[in-house]
Amino acid sequence: MNKEIINQMKKRIVILGAGESGAGAAVLAKAKGFDVFVSDFSSIKPKYKDMLDAHGICWEEGRHTEADILNADEIIKSPGIPDKAPIIKKLKEKGTPIISEIEFAGRYTDAKMICITGSNGKTTTTMLTYHILRQAGVDAGLAGNVGNSLALPVAEDPHAVYVIELSSFQLDNMYDFKADIAILLNITPDHLDRYNYEMQNYVDAKFRIIRNQTAEDAFIFWNDDPIIAREIAKRHPQATLYPFAETHEAGVKGYTEDKKIIIETSNGTFTMEEDLLALSGTHNLYNSLASGIASKLVDIHDENLRASLSDFTGVEHRLEKVARVRGVDYINDSKATNVNSCWYALQSMTTPLVLILGGTDKGNDYSEIEELVKKKVHALIFLGVDNAKLHGFFDGKVPVIEDARSMEEAVAKAYKLAEKGDTVLLSPCCASFDLFKSYEDRGDQFKACVRNL
């Protein structure tokens, strides 16, 4: 649709949430001539207030004034605001269109979009893909769930390519946006509290990443994920398919053979010794294959791809080695906010473990990690306000179980319980909002406490 017509149709845009995505969307909307109002039910960080003020954008914090919101022609909603929020219910009753910042920004750029989602591995794959492109000299921007607005660079510092991490919450409010390259790493239960505890609702959200794709576009996915396989058979994606797997299965475009990774695209075949990959572990092999396929599809030269796959340093709060104290390794995996992420972490561990679990439960099924916990963990520390569900599942399955109400207490108890040669692993399985501002805050506190031992 012609962008001028959209402007005429959508005179007033109200943005709910004034974090990174909301503030960026406000700047872009203002630049495109809309009447813009920003409302945040919480407090707005000073840097975002300054940004809004500098662009002459009206805002409010600590409330949602209905008279200033319900008159909107279109709403741009922060992904953190659930559909059950009272203001969202009223907007839906009124029939006001509600979109995401990514959807809005996509209207105003013709850049190539490489979009990544999945229950686990999406941040690592996003950062790795971005690293590969930038090292190869591509004019690439980084956006989405990694903490960067897409709208702000579209408004003020446009790029030729964007590498975008997409959460299910962002995908929920995307309609006309199209990914040129879509990557779906895996689907396991997560955020079910936001999806009425219906797994299919979450699956449907993830598959929105292939919405509007044509045969000119690419869909990269893990070939051995049973949910993805079922949904592909049901949905018949229009995009050209690029499955990846650990072994050379029929039809896969990325795989390993004879201790090499092999990637096959129309831009040629890429090979690399598997032991030269910077990221170790099976889950990171999949991340490297997905990034490698995407990179070959945008014609990154083999020598650039090989160099970047071998020198990438990883993602903070994801299996991050913090320190070794008196023969005990401390690993920060605070980004493991679901059970499957913790499963990958436990699978990669080779020493006896003291495991720190807990936080805000999102409908978790801990049976997925039960056998690994019984096999590898000799002490559990439950870090949270309400640990009843954890006790109900794990009591009697591990020799020692302790509770902690702060990170300082959790690390102090782990220090006493760990023996030389052990690893203390923070891999919580849960969201962080009971005791911490975010998973980053939780991980930062863990690192600070470890360094103070």
Where are these regions (language model features)?
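Nucleotide phosphate-binding/pyrophosphate-handling subdomain across enzymes
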Residues: 3-7, 11-12, 22-32, 139, ...
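Residue-level signal for inorganic ion chemistry
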Residues: 29, 75, 116, 145, ...
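Phosphate-binding loop of NTP-binding sites
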Residues: 30-31, 67-70, 79-223, 227-239, ...
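C-terminal helical cap/extension that packs against the catalytic core
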Residues: 49, 367-422
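Short internal beta-strands
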Residues: 35-41, 219-223, 356-357, 376-385
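Beta-strand->loop->alpha-helix junctions that form or flank phosphate-binding loops
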Residues: 60-63, 99-103, 238-256, 308-310, ...
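N-terminal leader/targeting and accessory segments in enzymes
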Residues: 1-100, 104, 392
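Residues in the short beta-alpha loop(s) of Rossmann-like NAD(P)-binding domains
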Residues: 19, 41-42, 146, 224-225, ...
